[in-house]
Amino acid sequence: MSKISAKLVKELRDRTGLGMMECKKALEETNGDVEQAIDNLRKSGQAKAAKKAGNIAADGAIVIAQEGNKAILLEVNCQTDFVAKDDNFTEFANKVAELALANNTTDVAAISELDYGNGQSVEEARVALVQKIGENIQVRRAKIIEGDNLASYRHGLRIGVVVSSEGGQEDSGKNLAMHIAAFNPVAVNDTDVPADILAREKDIAEAKARESGKPDNIIEKMIEGGLRKYLDEVVLVRQAYVMDNEKKVGDVLKADGVTVKDFVRFEVGEGIEKKQEDFAAEVAAAQAAAAQ
């Protein structure tokens, strides 16, 4: 067997997107023949799936599965909303959610190892779907919520909510889930707002207040007002109710005898930064490469 040079490994890596060890192994199997190595990798599906893995998957779908007193929200990402509506993508996302819930796991690494059926793991099924559809597809995150009274709502493919509550009418939970989908609260009550978020908002309110140049006693009131305004926007019971904006959610809950125990809200692509193409820079780079 001829020695595989680093240059050959780099060439195969650049052309397939695979890791160095996979490229070296593929080249060893073909005695350094790059084209044959690529053909072999394409036949096995590795090259295409690995190349797509470098693409940013910021679209996708939120799926919800429920069994008894447990429900799961799962986000599966792809690159375009067109693929997010594809039946194969939808089937994969729903099945993965059901498997994760049945195995009571939200760990993405653990989910990838679950038995998908037909002799495949979830990860192997994902790779096969990448090959079939032609986009990067990733299982991003999952959350399980438990409760005797669960209600869910999905707004299109992009937003999913599950609420655990006690009391109220049959449609109380559903209406509440719709409200949470629309207004995106961070907590049920003031005391549930994370301390680090409150501290950050207080710093922002103080910085704005001090720009006014007013006396300290006035600044303190301005800070309190800024925090109060922030809490009105992000705390569920303080928000104007989506079904009747003349009422606060807290007042509606009290009148209906509803207690919110917990909720989970997922929105597709939260926190994922989409790549912004700079076509002028891309053309300039291509011209520079051609000139070399």
Curated annotation (Swiss-Prot):
It comes from the Bacteria. It is found in: Cytoplasm. Its main location: cytoplasm. Coiled coil: none annotated. The keyword Protein biosynthesis applies. One of its GO terms (molecular function) is translation elongation factor activity. Transmembrane segments: none annotated. Associates with the EF-Tu.GDP complex and induces the exchange of GDP to GTP. It remains bound to the aminoacyl-tRNA.EF-Tu.GTP complex up to the GTP hydrolysis stage on the ribosome. Belongs to the EF-Ts family. This is Elongation factor Ts. It comes from Psychrobacter sp. (strain PRwf-1). The lineage of its organism: Bacteria, Pseudomonadati, Pseudomonadota, Gammaproteobacteria, Moraxellales. The gene is tsf.
